């Protein structure tokens, strides 16, 4: 009984007073304390700092049209315009040299002699094939087609196995530069040699392949 009625120590009284203090201090004012939930749409400061550098391109310009769509469309239109311009330039380009009208008031004559290989010397109709080849070669030549007139047989010798042709071209009068560059023996003979190298005559495949078998003179 003495122990139960013993008065409490000062320390115990202090602890009890702290526990039994006014509860008003623990209650929020006006009971307005609310927990604000984090919205998924509101980016956190860390997310804002890590925003993609391409995010401005995803902004809407008109309706659902994004900025990147506008940029890509402009770029494609620019490429299409360039391609169309290049096509039009290629179609409408006019070569002034091809359309230049020259007054071909003079004639230029060459004689070309072809040595026929022995295995083809007795081939019938060979001279006709050669005439067609010479005519087609110069008529289809980009350099001399405008000036070529004719190719005629001048001599056909079975004994010597040679055939000589008379080549005639129309040329401008008194044009030294034209005669020097466009009607040179090297050019006329070179076109013929190239023709034999590109395509042989079926009945005489070795004809014209030997450089010594072609002779051109005026």
UniProtKB/Swiss-Prot annotation:
Keywords: Endoplasmic reticulum, Membrane, Transmembrane, Transmembrane helix
TM regions (residue ranges): 66-86
Membrane topology of the entry: Single-pass type I membrane protein
Location(s), subcellular: Endoplasmic reticulum membrane
The keyword Metal-binding is assigned to this record: no
Chief localisation class: endoplasmic reticulum
A GO term from the CC aspect: endoplasmic reticulum membrane
Tree of life domain: Eukaryota
Chain intervals for the UniProt region annotation (Disordered): 1-54
InterPro entries: TTMP
Name of the protein in its database record: TPA-induced transmembrane protein homolog
Organism of derivation: Mus musculus (Mouse)
């Amino acid at each position: 009984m003495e122990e139960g009625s013993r008065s409490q120590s000062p320390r115990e009284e202090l602890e009890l007073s702290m526990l039994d203090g006014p509860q008003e201090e623990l209650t929020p004012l006006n009971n307005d304390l609310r927990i604000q939930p984090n919205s998924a749409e509101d980016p956190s400061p860390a997310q804002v700092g890590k925003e993609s550098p391409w995010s401005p391109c995803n902004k809407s310009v008109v309706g659902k049209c994004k900025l990147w769509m506008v940029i890509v469309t402009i770029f494609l239109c620019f490429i299409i315009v360039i391609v169309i311009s290049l096509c039009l330039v290629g179609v409408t380009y006019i070569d002034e040299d091809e359309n230049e009208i020259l007054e071909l008031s003079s004639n230029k004559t060459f004689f070309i002699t072809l040595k026929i290989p022995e295995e083809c010397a007795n081939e019938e109709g060979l001279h006709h094939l050669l005439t067609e080849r010479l005519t087609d070669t110069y008529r289809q030549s980009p350099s001399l087609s405008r000036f070529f007139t004719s190719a005629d047989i001048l001599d056909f010798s079975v004994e010597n196995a040679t055939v000589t042709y008379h080549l005639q071209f129309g040329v401008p009068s008194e044009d030294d530069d034209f005669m020097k560059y466009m009607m040179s023996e090297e050019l006329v003979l070179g076109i013929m040699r190239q023709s034999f190298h590109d395509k042989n005559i079926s009945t005489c495949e070795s004809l014209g392949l030997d450089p010594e078998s072609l002779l051109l003179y005026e």
